[in-house]
């Protein structure tokens, strides 16, 4: 299964944030950049797992709620910020339309993510299972998604 990059509608995340303050906001500032991530199916529900651009701190991070893309050199996937998604709330990212430097990063991230797609799926499913069964360490549970999964079911 090839993993692709998606963006998510800001209106949808704004709606979820009304009920769950842990739902991340889009990056704004000098250059508006929507959240980019992957979509995974976990127990018959779809989840959007956002990625984070490379930062020095990623190189030394060790936690079960992240996946380090190329050992953190290319960023991370933040499983702790996964949100449930519905069809129409997320859209395939056309990497070819991105700025050259950013396009290069996205292609490299895509290569690593697709080489390790099975591992990524296992991490997401394990974290989700630990969360719903109340087996996550408290310091990780406090970072993870909250009511947004319930809300997603209620708006379907």
Locations of the language-model features?
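GIY-YIG nuclease catalytic motif and its immediate N-terminal context
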Residues: 1-31
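A broad, low-specificity signal marking well-ordered, structured residues that form hydrophobic/aromatic
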Residues: 4-6, 46, 77-83
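Residues at the C-termini of beta-strands that transition into short coil/loop
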Residues: 9, 52, 86
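Residue-level detector of flexible, active-site-proximal loop/helix-junction positions
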Residues: 12, 55, 89
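A short secondary-structure junction signal
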Residues: 17-19, 49-50, 94
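Compact nucleic-acid interaction/catalytic patches
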Residues: 28-30, 41-78
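Short beta-strand-centered aromatic/proline hotspots
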Residues: 35-39
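C-terminal terminal-subdomain/extension
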Residues: 70-156
């Amino acid at each position: 299964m090839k993993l692709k990059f998606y963006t998510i509608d800001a209106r949808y995340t704004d709606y979820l944030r009304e009920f769950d303050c842990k739902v991340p906001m889009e990056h704004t500032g000098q250059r508006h950049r929507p959240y980019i991530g992957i979509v995974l199916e976990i127990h018959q529900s779809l989840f959007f797992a956002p990625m984070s651009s490379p930062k020095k701190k990623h190189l030394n991070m060790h936690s079960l709620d992240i996946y380090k893309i190329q050992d953190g050199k290319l960023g991370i996937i933040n499983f702790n910020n996964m949100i449930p998604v519905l069809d129409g709330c997320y859209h395939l990212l056309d990497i070819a339309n991105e700025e050259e430097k950013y396009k290069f990063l996205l292609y490299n991230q895509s290569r690593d993510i697709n080489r390790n797609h099975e591992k990524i799926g296992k991490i997401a499913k394990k974290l989700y299972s630990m969360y719903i069964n109340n087996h996550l360490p408290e310091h990780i549970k406090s970072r993870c998604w909250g009511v947004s999964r319930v809300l997603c079911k209620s708006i379907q």
